Curated annotation (Swiss-Prot):
This is Small ribosomal subunit protein bS20. GO terms for cellular component: cytosol; small ribosomal subunit. Keywords: Ribonucleoprotein, Ribosomal protein, RNA-binding, rRNA-binding. Binds directly to 16S ribosomal RNA. It comes from Flavobacterium psychrophilum (strain ATCC 49511 / DSM 21280 / CIP 103535 / JIP02/86).
Length: 83
């Protein structure tokens, strides 16, 4: 266990960030799954812009890598256009 006040604070702040990052990542994954099971093109197109925005936010906060974000956006866009 840490002995310094700053180390204790760092442990607390890291835990808060970890919980928030996990929530945001899980929410995005659920939105991606919902998009992939969509069968209607208009519904999927509406969901796509929301999902792409969520992916961009994760990449901006370094929760996921920029290249992974690009690959996900590309795959999802191709999926929606193929409907």
């Amino acid at each position: 266990m840490a002995n310094h006040k700053s180390a204790l604070k760092r442990i607390r702040s890291n835990e808060k960030k970890r919980v928030l990052n996990r929530y945001q990542h899980k929410t995005t994954r659920n939105a991606i799954k919902a998009l992939r099971i969509a069968t209607d093109k208009t519904e999927a197109t509406a969901k796509l812009s929301n999902v792409i925005s969520m992916i961009d936010k994760l990449a901006k906060k370094n929760i996921i890598h920029d290249n992974k974000a690009s690959n996900l956006k590309s795959k999802l866009t191709r999926f929606v256009s193929s409907l």
